[in-house]
Each structure stands twice: as structure tokens, then as C-alpha cells.
């Protein structure tokens, strides 16, 4: 090979190397795994709550592989709300998200996004992410304090098209509700096994667990029920504190049922308060907000432990379709929890990514 040909090949090789370097710099890669950070958020919205819960709240933040290597790149954010539990679930969700997101980002490096997992448990184990004169203004915390703090601390795409909200059980309830109320803030919602969509099935007086709730005489009794692993008594009482607070009541909340000669009867004024914040009953008044969302999805297990969840999930989807509002509702064989980790990676994350805007 003569010197001129060698020079030509060297120049071509140099150009190819330079172009590859430019491509690597412009496109995020998944050479490193994502990382989970635990941070504290100043929750001014919780100030003055009657349960004595702190105004500094723990939060997990998943940063995708490539976040540190690409300081000029901004990322969309998924706010993922956990469910009601008598134990700690935040760390479990951190592990699920890390595994699912690492796999997704490896396969789709141009669709990397941040995942924020805030604490939603108060001292009665569930805030339901609602504003409450007793439990504190958790809705305001999620949509205000939290979003503002994350947008300030991290390189986010700080607009509607760069935000998603999702959740499981209590968190699924909140994801649908907050998306309806704040469609200017979130672009897409995904609810996994969402509870509390309406006052049906095991939320009604046919559930004998209501007798345990009616027997509670104080907030301390609710906390005792939790230590005794009495899920229903704790969960229903906590929902009452969130949905129908009353500082003058024994458990600082009004209940939708009362006992009358050995049977449970409805308390209409409380039922109205509960149904006002239940997503299935909110649809008619929030059609415009639902239509403003890029996507709405629900999934649930056919064998869910809580009978109201499959029924109300289907009804929610049917109601939206009747109003010509696009929605995805998918049932599968599984209970309330056992398929959720795998479906985070196989269903939720790809759906969320398809409805977010990424920096080019």
C-alpha cells in the first residue's frame, strides 16, 4: 500500500473514531447500573397534623445508568406511590424498581427516566395521599413539596410532558385520583391493583371487619391493631382519618357505618364524603382532565385478595370508554401482590416510557 493510500485510510479511520465519540457523547448509555438514593424532603404541607407525624419525609430516588456521565441531559420523572402496609415497603419498592429499570434502560438507553418513591405511610400506616385536617395534607405534599424538591435537586424535565404518576393499591388509588385532579402536572397515570375506587364489595357493610373498626376507641387503638397485624381494622380506620377526619370523634374520624340493634347501617353524610374522593365517582366531574392525559392504564389480578378491586377496576375502564376516553385495563391471573414485581418491568415501565417526552 503506497503512502497516499495509507494516509487516506488513516484519515477515514480518524473520522470514524471521531463520529463514534460524538455519538457516545450525545446518546445516554447503560454502561453503568442505576443507583438508588435515599433523601429527605421538607414536607411543609404536613405541618400541624394531629397524628404528630414529622414534616421531614423519607424518599427513594432511582437515577438511571448514565445520569452522572451525562451532566447536560435532563430526564423525565415517574412518581411511584406505594400501597398500604403494616410493615415497611419503601425499600422493597426500591429493589423492584432498580431491577426493572436497569433492565429497561439497558434495552432502551434513549428512554431512561428517574423514578421517585416517596413515603406515604403515616403513624396509622396509610395516608392514602389525601389532604386531611387530622392526618395532614398529603396530597399537597405529593404535588407540591415533593415535585418542587425533586425538580430543584435533580436534572428533570420539569413540565407536564416529563412527569408520570403510578402506584400500587393505596398508591394506585392515589395515582388515578391525583392525575384527575392535577392533569396539568402529570401526563400519564398507571394504577396497579388500585384500591378504594368505590364503596363496593368488601368496602360495604357485608364485610364483618367493620365491627372491629367500630370497636376502636382511640387512635392508640388503631396503632395497637396494627401491632397485632389486624390489617382490615387498621386500613379502614386509616382511610377514615384520611377521607372523613373529625378531631372530635373517638378515632378522630367519622365512619360510614354505625351499629343499630346488631346490624350495620349507612351514615349517609359520611358516605357522601367518601364517595366524593373515590376515583370511580369522580369521573363525571373530571372528564376534561382525564381527556387531557396522554394515557391512563389499570391492571389487576383476577384473584385479588380484595374483592372490590377487580370489579371497580373494570368499571373504571368501562366508564372511561363509554365517555370516549382512551384507557387500558388489563386483568391477569394473580392476587394482590404476587405478580406486581414482574409487571412493573413488563407492563408499567414500558407504558410510562411510551407517554413521556425525552430530551433528544
What are these regions (language model features)?
Residues 12-21:
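Bacterial N-terminal signal peptides
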Residues 26-360:
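Non-catalytic cap/lid and distal C-terminal segments of serine-dependent acyl enzymes
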Residues 2-13:
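Bacterial N-terminal signal peptides that target proteins for export
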Residues 1-4, 23, 349:
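Generic cytosolic/nucleocytoplasmic N-terminal low-complexity/intrinsically disordered segments
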